[in-house]
Amino acid sequence: MVIGLSTMLEKTEALFASDHASVVSMNLFVALLCACIVLGHLLEETRWMNESITALIIGSCTGIVILLISGGKSSRILVFSEDLFFIYLLPPIIFNAGFQVKKKQFFRNFMTIMLFGAIGTLISFVIISFGAKHLFEKMNIGDLTIADYLAIGAIFSATDSVCTLQVLNQDETPLLYSLVFGEGVVNDATSVVLFNAIQRFDLTNINSAIALEFAGNFFYLFILSTALGVAAGLLSAFVIKKLYIGRHSTDREVALMMLLAYLSYMLAELFHLSSILTVFFCGIVMSHYTWHNVTDKSKVTTKHTFAAMSFLAEIFIFLYVGMDALDIEKWDVVRNSPGQSIGVSSILLGLILLGRAAFVFPLSFLSNLTKSSPDEKIDLKKQVTIWWAGLMRGAVSMALAYNQFTTSGHTKVLGNAIMITSTITVVLFSTVVFGLLTKPLVKHLQPSSKQSSTTALQITLRSSFHDPILHEPLLSTQGQSEYDPEQHVSFRMFWKSPSRFTH
């Protein structure tokens, strides 16, 4: 009896210790998120930095500190899970992308976007897969199967164009922004559909019948996922329109929109469809129909709530990727063969550059043949910008790599460990190095005139104080004349007159 009671007390103490560790981890992570937001805002106007790179660097620095404190045992305060990423973090990002998209530009360039996002991703997938198979077999990095090589193609075909989109201006370059933005979403969806199809099929003996079945399954998922997203968006519009006749409730409207959007994502997961495509088109349909059936207060609330959720999810992902990159367990397996890991990373970066160029320039040429107006054509500078925008790799690549090459985030197999560490290296290098060069490159290729910059500033200020679509001010216009939009906010000014900045 005494032994049983002692065992129970030990288990209770261990449980409390575990709960306390979780609370400490969450406190630290929330504090880091706040730091990322503040520093990202302060560094927003710099020539090189953006919020994604800021979060990645803060995550890496935090990982180093934790690694030193733990005596080299761990650099993590949370365990990475691809389920956490795909079920909780990705939905708000993709839904907000569809909800905030400028539909006129998106559908005007829909065929070009699908050309880049679907056909282009397939071309990149083929080049990376066969290039990796041909080169990695010579390096003898481990027993990778044909399914692994095809998965590598899908993993590194998934782009992350956040850095470029933060630099581009929707009002100054609507065509370019629409193409980069639309292609990024369709690209992620295509990569995930390809990855899921690879895992579903037995690809040990590929023949024409399996290839046709694979292609048929791919287009089946694409079409059905889009249809489900459209249906979910229309259902939300119908429910909100019929449910609150004469008695609109902002709380219920916002809650219903959020839940129905998330339901569309989970239904796609339930039926093994592309949840990314589903929730993206659900967001587009909701912004076109559902949004106009709610009150003005609900319009303002949903617009900013969805944007804030998406923003937090993006920062969370980059922060964790930076922290997880220094996890000692992943690098321990490959420490005896660092040259192989560096070689694999270099080859993957080269294949990414080649795979991207192999479709951007030829498909741009084909797209230009169908355009009559010079404004609708993609000139060489725009093509280079589109090519560059897709060179960064992010959390989608990380999550897919974990899914393919690890079990519960861990692996002791050399080939799998090399692929995980190489994925981390490619994500870090492309996000930081390519990301740092993005601002000056885009500014050089797409210079904004002084007049257009002034116009964009005026548009931003008008939309900040009064949204013409909503017919409702977002901020109070009292004392508007005292507000100087070009005034630089610094810590020195904050300490001199804190009331001016806090009230």
UniProtKB/Swiss-Prot annotation:
Gene3D superfamilies: 6.10.140.1330. Residues 44-51, 131-138, 196-219, 287-305, 367-383, 438-503 are vacuolar. InterPro entries: Cation/H_exchanger_CPA1, Cation/H_exchanger_TM, NaH_exchanger. GO terms for biological process: potassium ion transport; regulation of pH; response to salt stress. It comes from the Eukaryota. Keywords: Antiport, Glycoprotein, Ion transport, Membrane, Potassium, Potassium transport, Sodium, Sodium transport, Transmembrane, Transmembrane helix, Transport, Vacuole. It is found in: Vacuole membrane. Expressed in roots. Glycans are attached at residues 50, 293, 368. This is Sodium/hydrogen exchanger 3. It comes from Arabidopsis thaliana (Mouse-ear cress). The lineage of its organism: Eukaryota, Viridiplantae, Streptophyta, Embryophyta, Tracheophyta.
